[in-house]
Curated annotation (Swiss-Prot):
PTM comment: Formation of the three residue Trp-Tyr-Met cross-link is important for the catalase, but not the peroxidase activity of the enzyme.
Molecular function GO labels: catalase activity; heme binding; metal ion binding
Organism the protein comes from: Mycolicibacterium vanbaalenii
Assembly and oligomerization: Homodimer or homotetramer.
Active site: 108 (proton acceptor)
Reactions this protein catalyses: H2O2 + AH2 = A + 2 H2O; 2 H2O2 = O2 + 2 H2O
Homology family: Belongs to the peroxidase family. Peroxidase/catalase subfamily.
An annotated GO BP: cellular response to hydrogen peroxide
Protein name: Catalase-peroxidase
Length: 737
């Protein structure tokens, strides 16, 4: 079969069956077969199917964010505390307490988040579904969720699985004596696996060869946007890189993978030290587990990894480590033991590399998970990294003498771990939400709503400013299209397009952008109206569209929701925002350097992150091209003789059989459209543009907007899609995507 990195030209990818040296196996649709068996390189438009109501079994009109606010949180805590110590014979609690198991469940749910594309995290309850429910790093978490079923059953639609999975770990730590920073409810459940997350190219669990391909041994060259060192792990191999028990080398993997989860060195050390204060790992025997949940027999009812060992004989990771003598209590014993011993390598009963104190140190100090026996403490290779790595070592040595600092840092890092993918604080619900805020939350001060008279005055000032349609629309698009639905970051609210790093992004054309910002700030200062820069940018885009529509014969008013606020540079985490920089923007025919996928694939991913459907993506492309909204004022894809007018010319000319398309002589990935009769060059276009004429589904959409009776529909649909993008981040007024 073709390699995942092969990207034939659009036409070839869609008209040639896949070639291979082995017979192709085509399965019926109910077994997972699809057109992609024949054309594996075709763009995946299913990512843009935005109709969750079809698969949502909850009644129409149900709003989880309203329902969860009726939850009796105090009673939930009491019920949870009782559950934690009510050991079940079918899965006995280690040390008589399920708390450590629930902490691992919560951590592994939230820890899939990666900052590069904002995907992963706990916010949709994806740990219930494949592939996460069957990752080797999640062995036995199926039992943790099943243990929680009585609580989910009791509280029903008032408590989502998404919230319960992460609440459980948070409350478990409180139950064991730790003071957390708080907790926010508000994560609605999804009802099917996310199909838009790339977890890696490897086809075997714990594989890593593809994600480090071409790295030449440099463990910091992990493929983007991946956040784990191996397929099926949350972060790193606890035995060390590729199983090599080297704590210094393991620290490199730790720093890289936790950094991709937006954690710095202090936060990383706090999470590892704090999290491993509780519980144990499981590798008590050499029994081999049965198949994971997705491959398990029907009679196992959704549980996987079956084996005869439970309780003291449990096998999950194969590592048999109990870190402290108080595994169900918050204290500083992890660091006391880590620094109070020298360590020697040995094998777990399951054959995994782990560490124990030399000279039989701390013998018989650690309780057995079941019964009354005692054993010695043990550590993972990655635990020793917290002492032996110079940076982590400096941090943790201080905590050894100042445990109150560890508690504070762990509380903050744990809260960040659980909430990093929740988006703005306006989405935080419930009585446990902390009043304190942090830089990583992208705080936006509240804005002031504008009156209709104020809006009219400002629109007049913008129209008279000398700024062109292209400048106004392009600037609004650059601001708003930084939004991504994956972790609900970015967008126009906050006015951060005038701040670093967005002000300097190549994709934002800094010199041109600075001129527009200067003019808009002049209007802001001279208008006498208390208007935010963020509102002014979006309003400017609307003025540009209304002007372009009028030039095309349409008298329209683009809906506008005021009240955006302006953030300051001090409220902006430059490093964290740098991950929002678009490497490509197909809506403006911008392609940056070093992309690992052709532009058409990047477009689909961008549209998905903007929470657009395929029709919305299509009409936005056509409208922006008609307005001449391109990077660098390029004519690429501007398939009209009247740029700046909101017409459907783009689709008319794209579907015109009088135009013949061919690769440009420069072989630069662009195409030339010539008159089929005269050979005269009429247009130039990109791979993105030709996608809408060559892909059968997108051509069907393009034809709708090219039809003679669709001019009104085109304008109406373009405006609606535009407003969706402009308001995608408006969680402050309940309009967010």
């Amino acid at each position: 079969m073709p390699e995942a990195t092969e990207h034939p030209p659009i036409g070839e990818a869609q008209t040639e069956p896949a070639q291979s040296g082995c017979p192709m196996v085509i399965k019926p649709p109910v077994e997972g077969g699809s057109n992609r068996d024949w054309w594996p390189n075709a763009v995946n438009l299913k990512m843009l199917q935005k109709d969750p109501e079809v698969i949502d079994p909850i009644d129409e009109g149900y709003d989880y964010r309203e329902a969860v606010q009726t939850l009796d949180v105090d009673q939930l805590a009491r019920d949870f505390d009782e559950l934690c110590t009510n050991s079940q014979d079918w899965w006995p609690a280690d040390f008589g307490h399920y708390g450590p198991l629930f902490i691992r469940m919560s951590w592994h749910a939230a820890g899939t988040y990666r900052v590069q594309d904002g995907r992963g995290g706990a916010g949709k309850g994806m740990q219930r579904f494949a592939p996460l429910n069957s990752w080797p790093d999640n062995v036995s978490l199926d039992k943790a969720r099943r243990l929680l079923w009585p609580l989910k059953k009791k509280y029903g639609k008032k408590l989502s699985w998404s919230d319960l999975i992460v609440y459980a770990g948070n409350r478990a730590m409180e139950n064991m004596g730790f003071k957390t920073a708080g907790f926010a409810f508000g994560r609605p459940d999804y009802w099917e696996p996310e199909e838009d997350v790339y977890w890696g190219a490897e086809h075997e669990w714990l594989g890593s060869q593809d994600r480090y391909a071409g790295a030449n041994g440099d463990r910091t060259k992990l493929e983007n946007p991946l956040g784990a060192s191996h397929m099926g792990l949350i972060y790193v191999n606890p035995e060390g890189p590729e199983g090599n028990p080297d704590p210094i080398a393991a620290a490199i993997d730790i720093r890289e993978t936790f950094g991709r989860m937006a954690m710095n060195d202090v936060e990383t050390a706090a999470l590892i030290v704090g999290g491993h204060t509780f519980g144990k790992t499981h590798g008590a025997t050499d029994i081999v587990n049965g198949p994971e949940p997705e491959a398990a027999p029907l009679e196992q009812m959704g549980l996987g990894w079956s084996n005869p060992g439970v309780g003291i004989d449990t096998v999950s990771s194969g590592l048999e480590v109990t870190w402290t003598h108080t595994p169900t209590k918050w204290d500083n014993s992890f660091l006391e033991i880590l620094y109070g011993n020298e360590w020697e390598l040995f094998k777990s009963p399951a054959g995994a590399n782990q560490w124990r104190p030399k000279d039989n140190g701390w013998a018989d100090s650690v309780p057995m998970a079941q019964g009354t026996g005692k054993t010695h403490p043990a550590m993972l290779t990655t635990d020793l990294s917290m002492r032996m790595d110079p940076i982590y070592g400096e941090i943790t040595r201080r905590w050894l003498d100042h445990p109150e600092e560890l508690a504070e840092e762990y509380a903050k890092a744990w809260f960040k771990l659980l909430h990093r993918d929740m988006g703005p604080v306006q989405r935080y619900l419930g009585p446990l939400v902390p009043t304190q805020t942090w830089l990583w939350q992208d705080i936006v001060p509240a804005g002031k709503p504008l009156s209709d008279a104020d809006v009219a005055t400002l629109k007049g000032a913008i129209a008279d400013s000398g700024l062109t349609v292209q400048q106004l629309v392009s600037t609004a698009w650059k601001a708003a299209s930084s939004f991504r639905i994956s972790d609900m970051r970015g967008g126009a609210n906050g006015g951060r397009i005038r701040l670093q790093p967005q002000l300097g992004w190549e994709s934002n054309e800094p010199d041109e952008l600075a001129q527009v910002i200067s003019k808009l700030e002049e209007i802001q200062g001279s208008s006498g109206i208390d208007v935010s820069f963020a509102d002014l940018v979006v309003l400017g885009g609307n003025v540009g569209i209304e002007t372009a529509a009028k030039a095309a014969g349409f008298d329209i008013e683009v809906p506008f929701s005021s009240g955006r606020g302006d953030a300051t540079q001090e409220q902006t985490d430059v490093e964290a925002f740098s991950y929002l920089e678009p490497k490509a923007d197909g809506f403006r025919n911008y392609v940056g350097k070093g992309l690992n996928l052709p532009a058409e694939y990047q477009l689909i991913d961008q549209a998905n992150l903007l929470n657009l459907s395929a029709p919305q993506m299509t009409v936005l492309i056509g409208g922006l091209r008609a307005l001449g909204i391109t990077h660098g004022d390029s004519k690429l894809g501007v398939l009209t003789d009247t740029p700046g007018q909101l017409t459907n010319d783009y689709f008319v000319n794209l579907t015109d059989m009088g135009v013949k398309w061919a690769p440009a002589p420069a072989d630069d990935g662009t195409y030339v459209g010539t008159d089929r009769d005269t050979g005269e060059v009429k247009y130039t276009a990109s791979r993105v543009d030709l996608l809408f004429g060559s892909n059968s589904q997108l051509r069907a959409l393009a034809e709708v907007y090219a039809e003679d009776d669709s001019r009104d529909k085109f304008v109406k649909d373009f405006v609606a899609a535009w407003v969706n993008v402009m308001d995608a981040d408006r969680y402050d007024i309940g309009k967010g995507a």
